[in-house]
Amino acid sequence: MQDTLSLYELNALVRRSLEQCLPDEYWVQAELSDVRTNSTGHCYLEFVQKDPRSNNLIAKARGTIWANIYRLLKPYFEESTGQLFTSGIKVLVKVTVAFHELYGYSLTVQDIDPTYTLGDMARRRREVLRQL
């Protein structure tokens, strides 16, 4: 009989493998979805990517912004862009990759680049004006 692993053991192996293979911070482009803040100030959200032709989802990941980061990041982003930090906007975020045995894969946000969102807003504005 083959050696077996419990689900927890397998998930722990996945966590250790990800920690070794993806130890750094990464800048990731994505759209925000399902942004919500809990009573302790942590922000939980989904990052999504859609196919530009069909608008169908092609990638999704859970995200977390811990309260100590979110307290600084949200006002910085909103003041820089004039845009609420909410679902439906495209962002460039610096993340670390995490995997928890119980909660699975997620991205933890460390920073945000508001100039990326400003560029996307300007591009969308130009498209609307062109259609008029």
Please describe what each predicted stretch is.
Residues 1-132:
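Acidic, two-metal ion nucleic-acid-processing modules in DNA metabolism proteins
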